[in-house]
Amino acid sequence: MGFLKVLATSLATLAVVDAGTLLTASNTDAVIPSSYIVVMNDDVSTAEFNTHREWATNVHARLSRRKNGETGPGKHFEINGLKGYTASFDESTAKDIANDPAVKYIEPDMIVNATANVVQSNVPSWGLARISSKRTGTTSYTYDSTAGEGVVFYGVDTGIDISHSDFGGRAKWGTNVVDNDNTDGNGHGTHTASTAAGSKYGVAKKATLVAVKVLGADGSGTNSGVISGMDWAVKDAKSRGANGKYVMNMSLGGEFSKAVNDAAANVVKSGIFLSVAAGNEAENASNSSPASAAEVCTIAASTSTDGSASFTNFGSVVDLYAPGQSITAAYPGGGSKTLSGTSMAAPHVAGVAAYLMALEGVSAGNACARIVQLATSSISRAPSGTTSKLLYNGINV
């Protein structure tokens, strides 16, 4: 893999060699100006990757195109072999960097948001009871006492209020790529973590929880920040040992992003189950990321009467439904809150994945298929081309 190591060599010579592509965004409103994610070819070695980043830094400095304070290459990541980095370039420099044959593609960095969309008060939660029964209307949650013990849950979100009583001392901070405030200033991350693994509100009541903060107090972040969070979690899981059991929940989404999808795919390949919210735009989930990644478990939201929630995204990329309307779970400050959205549906599935890993020893790579196998065909009037499968923990199977 050749790199341009002598700056005096014309950049034009690279154009005749197979090189990367500068991708464009379908929704320019989501694009962060002058911000990019650079992804390298699969066969680029670590040494070549380092050399490329040094070269890119020099190209950025030499071309002096920094009209808006662009700073050049930034943080780099390596997720189970997927190498890349964030960068602040003007468009002309980005095109020049894309001409390096070591580059697979460059895409604009974009805004990503938490996917909860409705807040309701004084509504009892019903999701736990529904996932342990084959019919509606039950009021008890039945589960095996293993309850996700020995499994690590990564909440890639707005953070977790680790002092909340619903976590019973099982939650800790992992990383924060947003700011220096290791708190959940939004509440979304605490709620989703509680749904997955809270002692009172959660599915896998004995799992360990790790906060991976990639969204700020306003519920928004960047694709590059999300990728950094995934990168950290993969490395943390690796440090814990190859025989560990790991699940990740990402109740967030944005415009379609090849970089985010590729990163999510490599999270799964590394041995971490990944549950993802389908999104709340009432449109085909293939338009958003990471929901459209083939390797993840993409979750739509159901109602208490087994309907498809009016807001949920849909389509062939959806693996199954889970309770997502009027879900009560822990909230920062010691209390609880009732929220609706595919954000609430996805952690139910992450919790069941942790539950099955502890109970059956199912692997991360097979967990989504096992969950779909156990699911009941209960959703009435699912949108055309969308599964009718509804999450079920298999307690009476």
From Swiss-Prot:
User: Which subcellular locations apply to this protein?
Assistant: Secreted
Give GO terms for biological process.
proteolysis
The answer to whether the entry has keyword Nuclease is no
- Main localization category: secreted
The protein's name in its UniProt record = Subtilisin-like serine protease Pen c 1
Which InterPro entries does this entry report, sorted A to Z? PCSK9_ProteinaseK-like, Peptidase_S8/S53_dom, Peptidase_S8/S53_dom_sf, Peptidase_S8_Ser-AS, Peptidase_S8_subtilisin-like, Peptidase_S8_subtilisin-rel, S8pro/Inhibitor_I9, S8pro/Inhibitor_I9_sf
In the record, the note on similarity to other proteins reads: Belongs to the peptidase S8 family.
Which stretches make up the Inhibitor I9 domain? 35-113
Gene3D superfamilies the record matches: Peptidase S8 propeptide/proteinase inhibitor I9, Peptidase S8/S53 domain
The top EC class, named as a word, is: hydrolase
Activity control mechanisms: Inhibited by 0.1 mM diisopropyl fluorophosphate (DFP), phenylmethanesulfonyl fluoride (PMSF), chymostatin and elastatinal. Not inhibited by N-alpha-p-tosyl-L-lysine chloromethylketone (TLCK), N-tosyl-L-phenylalanyl chloromethyl ketone (TPCK) or N-carbobenzoxy-L-phenylalanine chloromethylketone (ZPCK).
A GO CC annotation recorded here is: extracellular space
Marked site, Not glycosylated, at: N113, N249, N284
Annotated site (Important for catalytic activity): N280
Which molecular function GO terms apply here? serine-type endopeptidase activity
